[in-house]
């Protein structure tokens, strides 16, 4: 919690310059580098990673 107050972002992406305060946000960010579209609409061709 204190990282939010001090602006510390120790979790860094190895593929770009993104950094964040907690590991769960980094895990979520890493999906942006993936080609896996986890959620697909059953009625059309729309798909998203998140």
UniProtKB/Swiss-Prot annotation:
Record flagged with keyword tRNA processing: no
Stretch forming the signal peptide: none
Keywords: Developmental protein, DNA-binding, Gap protein, Metal-binding, Nucleus, Repeat, Zinc, Zinc-finger
Entry superkingdom: Eukaryota
ZnF locations on chain (C2H2-type): 1-5, 11-33, 39-50
GO biological process: segmentation
PROSITE patterns, sorted: ZINC_FINGER_C2H2_1, ZINC_FINGER_C2H2_2
Location in or out of the cell: Nucleus
Annotated GO CC locations: nucleus
GO MF annotations in UniProt: DNA binding; zinc ion binding
SUPFAM superfamilies associated with the record: beta-beta-alpha zinc fingers (SSF57667)
Family designation: Belongs to the hunchback C2H2-type zinc-finger protein family.
Protein function: Gap class segmentation protein that controls development of head structures.
Protein name: Protein hunchback
Organism annotation: Pholcus phalangioides
């Amino acid at each position: 919690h204190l990282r939010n107050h001090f602006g510390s972002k120790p979790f860094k992406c190895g593929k770009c310059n993104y950094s964040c305060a907690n590991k769960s946000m980094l895990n979520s960010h890493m999906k942006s580098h993936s080609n896996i579209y986890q959620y697909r609409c059953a009625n059309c061709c729309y798909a998203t990673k998140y």
